[in-house]
Amino acid sequence: MKFLFDLFPVILFFAAFKVAGIYVATTVAMVATVLQIAWVWFKHRKVDAMQWLSLLIIGVFGGATLIFHNETFIKWKPTVLYWLFGVVLLGSVVVVRKNLIRAMMEQQVSLPETMWGRLNLVWALFFLVMGCLNLYVAYNFDTDVWVNFKLFGSMGLMVVFILAQSVWLARHMQERPANAANDANIGDDR
């Protein structure tokens, strides 16, 4: 359900583009992102840093698109977000010696130490490549193709990447000790 909620601005952007064009779609995406963050704040009294970052980027690139009446800015938005993700994943290991993928996933997955480094690198490279691919589509195809790629192509590639990664990780997963598995479920309401 969270995945669909996170896609809310993208889906509305796509629908608005099909009905009214890129500038209305950009406005809709900006408003939808603000509403999404307001809802999260209202419900949880906390908003993730990534959601704030997304709001900042849609504000800057969406705003530039509307002010300068130039769709190139909104086409750069996914690339900037992807590249930021990739750089943060790589930079966190180098600068603060923290593997962010491990920090996010180690409660669900037990892997050998070397695999965590590889997983972080693979995710970083995936995001860097996705940013390049977005620019390739944005500059070599018309806006209609880019909008379709933004929703269907990007999501499709993400799903394929996650499935391939799952198969790859399954070969390297370690069994957790019985007491560690029970400790992980303490307080679980299932």
Curated annotation (Swiss-Prot):
PANTHER family in the cross-refs: INNER MEMBRANE-SPANNING PROTEIN YCIB, INTRACELLULAR SEPTATION PROTEIN A-RELATED
Membrane topology: Multi-pass membrane protein
UniProt cross-references to NCBIfam families, sorted A to Z: ispZ, PRK00259.1-3
Subcellular location per the Swiss-Prot or TrEMBL entry: Cell inner membrane
Record's function text: Plays a role in cell envelope biogenesis, maintenance of cell envelope integrity and membrane homeostasis.
Keyword Transmembrane belongs to the record: yes
Keyword hit for tRNA-binding: no
HAMAP family (alphabetical): YciB
Family, per entry: Belongs to the YciB family.
GO cellular component, one term: plasma membrane
Pfam family, one: IspA
Membrane-spanning segments: 3-23, 24-44, 49-69, 76-96, 121-141, 149-169
Keywords: Cell inner membrane, Cell membrane, Membrane, Transmembrane, Transmembrane helix
Protein name as annotated: Inner membrane-spanning protein YciB
